[in-house]
Curated annotation (Swiss-Prot):
Record text on subunit structure and interactions: Interacts directly with the RNA polymerase.
InterPro entries: DksA_N, DksA_RNA_pol-bd, DnaK_N, Znf_DskA_TraR, Znf_DskA_TraR_CS
Gene Ontology cellular component list: cytoplasm
Highest classification ranks of the organism: Bacteria, Pseudomonadati, Pseudomonadota, Alphaproteobacteria, Caulobacterales
Sequence segments annotated as region (Disordered): 1-20, 51-70, 119-142
Alphabetical list of NCBIfam families matching this protein: dksA
GO BP terms in the entry: regulation of gene expression
A UniProt-annotated Pfam family: zf-dskA_traR
Similarity comment text for this entry: Belongs to the DksA family.
PROSITE patterns: ZF_DKSA_1, ZF_DKSA_2
Primary subcellular site in the record, as a coarse category: cytoplasm
Subcellular localization: Cytoplasm
UniProt name for this protein: RNA polymerase-binding transcription factor DksA
Amino acid sequence: MQTATVLVEKSDYRPSEDEPFMNDRQLEYFKQKLLAWKEEILRESRETVSHLQKETENHADLADRASSETDRALELRTRDRQRKLISKIDQALRRVEDGSYGYCEETGEPIGLARLEARPTATMSVEAQERHERRERVHRDD
């Protein structure tokens, strides 16, 4: 998310607890942060595809081939996780547009600026997320 941070930091603006929660300026700030993060992931994905296409060499040594296949599998797993992250970013951008961004989907209360800074795709407050995870653990243990 390095580029996302760089693009958002072009402005000195930082959301503050002293202003109305999710005002137009905050919404625009988080929208830009999400868009920059998405663009960074897409750029990395394009680089991966390019790298994988170039690396079609045949390894004579079995160990080299195994190592290359392991690297390739790891790269593809990483890209799959990032594909899922793009979906979460797109969902967050839709919430920005419909005005529900920044509010807990469970309680309707503000998620909090610090949490959104750390995890811009968050859909629940810390407390609601902890309750959700406890319920999941209980159901998993059944």
